[in-house]
């Protein structure tokens, strides 16, 4: 599905991941995606060097691309790519929830060891799989599918037992996290310039479109508010 998650779907999904011992290891990564609106390549490429816990700032300056090599080996590998536009280079302030998972993750890695995998001279990646490699987007999508399917089959059983309608989570891809963040942001913030900056949109019209989608009734409420404040006819 290409739609952002609703507030309820987002809450349900994250609560399920947080409580499920099989899926919990994905929780910090999903919080990061939903709390920063980063593109998937930016998120898998984030390094501890890009994270300033003291000032609570995330520096977005590159992303990782996972692709098949052109030779006969059919091997896949990561490459570092730099933002296509100046807007892609940005600094995102950390939400409290993002700060908390990063802090926790940092403490855990201090005990268990940091990522030593080297991609184009970069290392120290924050989010890695059990082999110490950065996540590849296809694996993230598989994990989301597994989580959603497991949740939905458990929910179906529970709903039958409790004689109610099941509340399902739709299947979605990792890109939807960014879309969902943008929707929540637009629902809570009216300053388009700020939204554009955090999202790293080169063109403000991209931001405007997302804003309009997230707030279909906004025109009506703006006019209503205006009429309340314009008691001057």
Describe the role of every protein-language-model region.
Residues 2-6, 59, 68-69, 80-104, ...:
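C-terminal catalytic core of Y-nucleophile DNA break-rejoin enzymes
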Residues 1-40, 44-46, 53-54, 65, ...:
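Basic, Lys/Arg- and aromatic-enriched nucleic-acid-binding interface segment
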Residues 55, 66-89, 96-98, 157-164, ...:
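C-terminal secondary-structure termini that scaffold catalytic or DNA-interacting sites
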Residues 36, 85, 128, 180, ...:
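Ser/Thr-centric signal marking residues that sit
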Residues 64-66, 99, 180, 199-225:
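Catalytic-site neighborhood detector that most strongly recognizes the C-terminal catalytic loop/helix
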Residues 15-26, 92, 108-117, 122-134, ...:
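Short, basic (Lys/Arg/His-rich) helix/loop patches that form interaction surfaces
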